[in-house]
UniProtKB/Swiss-Prot annotation:
Region (Disordered): 1-21
Protein name: Uncharacterized protein Mb1356
Species: Mycobacterium bovis (strain ATCC BAA-935 / AF2122/97)
Biased composition (Basic residues): 1-10
Domain of life: Bacteria
Length: 98
């Protein structure tokens, strides 16, 4: 009986969502869940709270939301540039809220 040939191009399976999760302290001292968003999956434009600039579609970034809220939903998520999130402790507020 002939052996089957392996496909030439195998697609790598995506890692499970729990593997990409991490919990970090936010700029206010609370804990936040942080998940990376690949450039290929970034299809909308968001505003980064760290620098107050747009995160355009096709730009890799992170999504952050509080872990201590029992019903943390879509409204609680924030999209940050990866360097802005990494340097959040050294930045002040970028926008004056009135």
């Amino acid at each position: 009986m002939a052996r089957r040939r392996k496909p030439l191009h195998r697609q790598r399976p995506e890692p499970p969502s729990w593997a990409l999760r991490r919990v970090e302290a936010g700029p206010d001292g609370h804990e936040y869940e942080v998940r990376p968003v690949a450039a290929a999956r970034a299809v909308k434009t968001y505003r980064c709270p760290g620098c107050d600039h747009e995160i355009r579609s096709g730009t890799a970034h992170v999504v952050v939301w509080p872990t201590d809220l029992p019903q943390a939903g879509v409204d609680d998520r924030r999209h940050w540039h990866t360097p802005c999130w990494a340097n959040r402790a050294t930045r002040g507020p970028t926008r004056k809220w009135t």
